[in-house]
């Protein structure tokens, strides 16, 4: 597993395009990009979020994020909980996960 860390995407996932993040061509779903706060991909809590979330889910890696102060906590709480590497997550998409606190 490879781990890459970034933060403050605020719903703008252009940094994960292949031309910006060329290392992804050798990554798999076992590799993780961790967004450390202010993910912003679940902002509206409806279909307006789909394009960005579907883009991330289509990448060859898994995106995990920790919520920040700019999140829609009510919308995030509506996603199902699961266990991932011994911790609780919210499954936003099969390969887009919110790491639960606590």
Question: What do these predicted ranges mean?
Answer:
Residues 1-4:
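Extreme N-terminal starter segment of soluble prokaryotic enzymes
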